[in-house]
Amino acid sequence: MEKTIKLIRVSLGIIFLWYGMLKFFPQLSPAEDLAITTIHKLFFGLINDTLSIKLLAIWEVTVGLGFIFGIYTRYVVVLFLAHMICTFTPLFILPDISFTHAPYAFTLVGQYIVKNVVFILAGILIYQNEINQRKEVKTV
């Protein structure tokens, strides 16, 4: 089971590193416009769009590298889960691009968002594994 969880952690890391790196290059990430629009609405336009996408890129790359190398895993999972929770906000603040018929028929964007449930469960699994490993070390 340990090897499987490590594979899940590294796989999530690769995905986050990849998606994050794309955001450093304008119009390369297919999620860029969605991310910029969401951040713009969440922060009432107070954060410059270019800055917001760069900060998101840094966040995603940090999570990716943390998962790939297994460093500060508990903290990385917290950053990861915070990010994942934020990915659901377009369902509420941008329903016109998330649904064809709210709340049951998703657009491609809505499907892209909802698939993150699987990522969240993987993150919880990684976190629980980290906690269990720490308990084992303390009892030895």
Regions found by a protein language model. Name each.
Residues M1-V140:
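Membrane-interface extramembranous regions
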